[in-house]
Each structure stands twice: as structure tokens, then as C-alpha cells.
Amino acid sequence: MAAGGAVAAAPECRLLPYALHKWSSFSSTYLPENILVDKPNDQSSRWSSESNYPPQYLILKLERPAIVQNITFGKYEKTHVCNLKKFKVFGGMNEENMTELLSSGLKNDYNKETFTLKHKIDEQMFPCRFIKIVPLLSWGPSFNFSIWYVELSGIDDPDIVQPCLNWYSKYREQEAIRLCLKHFRQHNYTEAFESLQKKTKIALEHPMLTDIHDKLVLKGDFDACEELIEKAVNDGLFNQYISQQEYKPRWSQIIPKSTKGDGEDNRPGMRGGHQMVIDVQTETVYLFGGWDGTQDLADFWAYSVKENQWTCISRDTEKENGPSARSCHKMCIDIQRRQIYTLGRYLDSSVRNSKSLKSDFYRYDIDTNTWMLLSEDTAADGGPKLVFDHQMCMDSEKHMIYTFGGRILTCNGSVDDSRASEPQFSGLFAFNCQCQTWKLLREDSCNAGPEDIQSRIGHCMLFHSKNRCLYVFGGQRSKTYLNDFFSYDVDSDHVDIISDGTKKDSGMVPMTGFTQRATIDPELNEIHVLSGLSKDKEKREENVRNSFWIYDIVRNSWSCVYKNDQAAKDNPTKSLQEEEPCPRFAHQLVYDELHKVHYLFGGNPGKSCSPKMRLDDFWSLKLCRPSKDYLLRHCKYLIRKHRFEEKAQVDPLSALKYLQNDLYITVDHSDPEETKEFQLLASALFKSGSDFTALGFSDVDHTYAQRTQLFDTLVNFFPDSMTPPKGNLVDLITL
């Protein structure tokens, strides 16, 4: 802390001078030194490898040790087949021992790209003297690799770098000692272990893990070991492990309570193109409007999760000074002020005229059960024209609404507008709820400028209430399916392109051309996407399946949680409908981020034989990771399984009794895999001790080796900060 309580200024990040140190190869005049100058209009100003056979690399040597925070790649002024589609960057204080700092790829365009390099270990910065760039794949298959320009930036102030260098040297020495300690203990070299630990005063692990090792490996006190594991679970020590596990989706069809005598009228009927919002405080889902296959609807419903019951708030909102019947509109909820806003709708071309094409805008007050018309025509108030299939998000904190995209409805036969036949799309608007004023933030643009955004329909847009950004991806523009993904910072008015959609990561991102419904969890920094059926009839039949994706905002990575892989088609006897909702479009999905539950209602199953068919099924979806209880049971199972195997060697009768009682209760007998594994355990009663050989433990007795392996398995559930080093000393020996 600086004098006067002021916080010390962050060290300045500046360009780091370097020289070319080594290279794998180069072709003709495309010398490695060319990457030192940025000449985007000169096709010869680049390094080009002589071949694309690995390993190809460049090693850069910095003028002096530095914390290398960023690497920037310059490019040629046009796309080029030799640009790096995939590459890795390594760094270290010497060229023989380097750490991976980055694994990424360049877009095949002319824009410079900057990447953040790993420069911290345990929140402590570490220095590099050498940087190694390893190309892995070029944009043109079987082309040599080219790098046009490289810039490194970071901190090279000796006052900052030297302490980091001292720490790094000490850290490496400490890790080497910990690897030795781990090796000595694994091989039961007790004297060497105790002597090294006493001399260096370096801890191999957290005291709790030492206690578990003592009880389990040295004393064979399995009951005490179980107690320590139970304490660890209750203290939340397995939480980090749980957060890193993949989700498993659990769909449940909701069958709401029915009120006697109401018949089918006590819940919303079949529909598509309706809208839903959720009040997470009261656990209430609100549903309004939609299209039932023959007409637009104006009914308004509330579903109470606690009561498991639908309540009809209004059979016809228009009669209560609310919006007329509609579909393909949008709604958003202000949970703080308990108000719902609705904007836009689809109108058939036969009923479009200058009066009907006005874009009305309504607000519903939940507490007073009243509608208020905020605007007869938002376009006249500086807002969007009448649109459908747009997106709308609420920023409760600043009391703002953001709406983006959607197709603008126009009258047919309008001669004066030469663009009338071409579809028009709405831009990005902000509505200040307090002042009731609209502001156009971005017009629809086909330009590829860094702040331009392309309008679309059927896209996803979400507001992250913590980092205050809108996230937009997917959608359609005329017959083009868009695959880009960008964020918009509402406070700084800045667009950040997360992915321009040109990278061919097929299978690693949600496919375009399918109806996507997305939700956001600001606490977990996750975006969830349910990908359903395509609206496009041609694309529909061959690939009918649901898939659920999660985007990790911090790690900038997609993962597919599941695909149903046409399960119903493959197994006609088993109805998919019992397990999960069938693929569809024009449905609605909302997410309760407090209770971590999704709700899905209705939609269009896209049956060509019955085009008017709509759905009225209602589902909840929970994304489940292994629970604390599951992990505790699993750990107890592993401990008791090992205890049983030890007993089986000395007292088979006692072991059999233990198997039937103590081990039996740690198995989930409803799980076929667990049950099968449990049934096979009995074979241990007929094995001799020589059947068990633990790899790499030939110098210690069998029991010690087996217990050590069990200990290493249990350690995996604990946070890295508590555990011994992951590697093994013998792995450092190269042949």
C-alpha cells in the first residue's frame, strides 16, 4: 500500500523487444526475421516453414526476462491459406524447459489478433526469457505455415520481474522436493521421507491428507478414514471437484394439479410462438399468447411451481386494456418492480395495413393485475417498427430494456419503397423505463467493421446482469443461417466479437439452422442452449434431435451436455415422449437461476402430415452434477471395496459377510453398472494374493501398494491446493 492509503498503480504493460533465436526451417526468402516488421500489404514479409511436417517452430529470445502477458499476430491484408488455423505457444527461462502458455487459432482474415498468455501460477506471476511458437495446422490443407508479424507485450521492469524470478526459482525447487517426498512415501522409504521433510520444512500436502494417508495406508484404520472423508465432504472440500464435472440433464414432465370441474380449461392449451417469463423470487412462470394452429391467442397464465398449478389471469387481455391476440412477440420481466413488458407480433400479410402495422408496447403490473399501454406506435416514439422473431432483455438495475433484431413487417404492394420486396431487419434499441424514451444504439449493418452488428431473426440474446453485457448468437437473415457470436457492453457501447462464425469447429458448437432457445446464469457464468427442430422443412426430417449445450463465459468454450440421437427412431417400442420433450420449434424455455431449473412449454413438432398440430406439454429440466452425497457414498464404496479385497486374502468367510452387508449398502442397486460391478466383486474370494500386482510398486509389499493406489484415487476429489504434486518422479526420466 502506498503512502496515504492509495493503492499502488498496476505495473505498465509494454511492448517487449525480442530477437529470433532458433527455428525449425524456412523456405526461400521467407526468413524468420520477417516477423519483426509489420507489413500487411507485402506478401513476402513473413516467415514460412519449409514443410508442414512437425515439429515446426520459432523460438524468440527476449532482451531480458519479462512477464509475457500477451502475444499479437499481424496478418496479410487478404485471407491466406498459410495462416495458422491452430498453434501453441510455450515459454520458459530456458529453451529446454518450457510451459504451455496458449493453445488457440487465428481467424483467416486481415485483422490483427491479440491473445492473453498464461503468466501466473497460483496467482503469482512468473517470468520467461524464451517464447516458442509451434504451428499445428494451416487454413489451407497441406500448405506450409506462415507467420507475418509477432508482437509480445508484458512487464519487463526489473523491480517487478526479479522478485517473480526469485519466486519462480524457489517454486520449482519446492515442487522438485515435493516430487521426491511423494516418491519416497509411495515406496515406503520412511527414513528418507522424514529426513528430507525435516531438513526442508516443505509440506507434501495439506495436514488433513497426511492424516488420511496415516489412517488408510499406514494403519489400515478404514473407519477413521471414512470419518475423515465425511468431514471433508461436509466442509465443502469436494466442491471444486464437483464444479469441474460434466452436467447430466434430467427432464421431468410436469403434470399440473387440476381443479375439479374445470376440464381442460385449467391450463394453457396447445400453442407455438407464445412467450414466457419467470419471476424467480416467487417461482412463478407467466405465459402469454401464441398461435394454436388456426388463430392467435390472447390468454394470460401464471404457473406456480410451489403449488404445481396453472392460474388463468385473463382469457382475453385485450378486454382488460391489454395487448390483442398475438404470436411471435417478445416479453421480459422486471423482477425488482414486478412488471412484465411485451413488444412486437406477427401479422399475416392479408391483414396488414397502416393501422395494424403500428407497433404497440404494453406493461403489466403483477401486484395490481393491470395492463398499461406505453405506446401505440414505438416507431413514432423513436423506437423499433413492428417486428416479430426479435429479442428483448431487461436490465433491472438500470431500469432499461434492450431489443435487437426481428423482421420488420411492411405492407405489400408498396410502390414507393424499392426495397419493399427485400426483408428488412430491426437494429439494436434501448428503452429507458423511467423516462419512457427509446434510443437507437446500432442500425442493421452488413459491414464487417469492429462495432457493426448484423440484424437477424430467430437469434438468441441474453443479458448478463453482473458483467453488464448482452450476448447475441445464431439466427437467420433471409436464407442465410448466421453462426457468429458477439457481446455488447451496455455501459461502454462496445461490441466484442467472440466468434465470427468462420472457424470450422463443427461438432464443437451448436449447429446453425436449428431453433435455439438460450438462458443465462450470471452466478455460474454460463449460457445454456437447447437446440431443437429446424423451421426449414427441407432440413427437418433427416436430423431430428434435441441437443443441449453450455457455453462457459470465462473459459470461452462450448460443451455439449447431451444429444438424444434420435433415440425414439432407433427404439420404436420406447417412447421418447416419456423421457424428454420431442424436438420442436416455436416453443419457449425459461430459466430460474436461483433454483437452477429450466421450464419448457409447447411449440410446433413440425409434423408435415399435420401442419396445424401444436403441443401443450410442460417440462422441467435440471442440469445435475454429482452431489456431495453421491461422492461420499462413492468414496465409502471405494474404501469398503478395498477393505473387502484385503479381508478376502486372509478370511474369505468374514469377507463374504462384509460384502453382503457393509459393502452392499454403499451401492446404488438401481444403477445397472454399479450393480454389475458389485456382483463381480465376489470373484475376489477365489483369487490368490499373487493375482494382484500394482504397477511400479515392486519394492513394497502388496497391501501397502494397493492402499497407496486407493489413497491416490481419493486425493483426486480434493482441491489442487491441498494435494501432492500430480506428476511422478520416475516420469522425468527420459530414455
From Swiss-Prot:
Domain CTLH positions: 206-258
Protein name listed in UniProt: Muskelin
Keywords linked to the UniProt accession: Acetylation, Cell projection, Cytoplasm, Kelch repeat, Nucleus, Repeat, Synapse
UniProt GO cellular component terms: cell cortex; cytoplasm; cytosol; GABA-ergic synapse; nucleoplasm; postsynaptic endosome membrane; postsynaptic specialization membrane of symmetric synapse; ruffle
Organism of derivation: Homo sapiens
Subcellular location: Cytoplasm; Cytoplasm, Cytosol; Nucleus, Nucleoplasm; Cell projection, Ruffle
InterPro entries, sorted: Beta-prop_ATRN-MKLN-like, CTLH_C, CTLH_complex_component, Gal_Oxase/kelch_b-propeller, Galactose-bd-like_sf, Kelch-typ_b-propeller, LisH, Muskelin_N
Gene name, Swiss-Prot/TrEMBL: MKLN1
Primary localisation category: cytoplasm
Self-association and partners: Homodimer; may form higher oligomers. Identified in the CTLH complex that contains GID4, RANBP9 and/or RANBP10, MKLN1, MAEA, RMND5A (or alternatively its paralog RMND5B), GID8, ARMC8, WDR26 and YPEL5. Within this complex, MAEA, RMND5A (or alternatively its paralog RMND5B), GID8, WDR26, and RANBP9 and/or RANBP10 form the catalytic core, while GID4, MKLN1, ARMC8 and YPEL5 have ancillary roles. Interacts with RANBP9. Part of a complex consisting of RANBP9, MKLN1 and GID8. Interacts with GABRA1. Interacts with the C-terminal tail of PTGER3.
Protein's job: Component of the CTLH E3 ubiquitin-protein ligase complex that selectively accepts ubiquitin from UBE2H and mediates ubiquitination and subsequent proteasomal degradation of the transcription factor HBP1. Required for internalization of the GABA receptor GABRA1 from the cell membrane via endosomes and subsequent GABRA1 degradation. Acts as a mediator of cell spreading and cytoskeletal responses to the extracellular matrix component THBS1.
A single GO BP: vesicle-mediated transport in synapse
